[in-house]
Amino acid sequence: AFDRLFITSSSKTKLGFPEVNLGIMPGYGGSGRAYGRIGTKAVLDMMVTGRPIGSMDAIKTGLADELVGDADDLDEAMRKWIIGCKGEKPILIQLETVVDATEIVAARDKYLKRLRADHTPAPAAIIDHVENFGHDKSAMSAGEIEVFPNLMVSSASKNLRRVFYLTDAVRRSARGASNIKRLHVVGAG
């Protein structure tokens, strides 16, 4: 865990939890740390959809602490912050970790009604995880140990990881010059 998160203002800077796209959930305590920083609604949206957020949204939600111009400015910003601490242990501001039942119900309605649990078990498992362990950041991080392995060995996760590797292979093979001289499209109507 970090005492302070610095990010660049580049449009390429993205923060998120893409694990759901592989049929798993965040691990290594990430769900608990993020939940403590941004609360139920925001963490569920990020973890269940797998959509990343840009640097400005990360600052607004509290996922990141400080925005710098570009990667070259990171060292100087961190140095200034460390000098400003003067040996004191920094205080990381945490939100109250109280699970809001209405947000859990809203998340189930919003995210799960279009999904088949046997094809994509991770979103439901993530919502259950927040509901069961969200009362305590430490319990939430420890709860990952119960949930993550079951998702990892599921057939849905295995298939989603296979799709990821195949898609990545197609992207890599599509790079470079093409020797195609003529192309016909049949049945494009």
Positions of predicted regions on the chain:
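Hydrophobic, secondary-structure "cap" segments at the distal end of domains
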Residues: 30-41
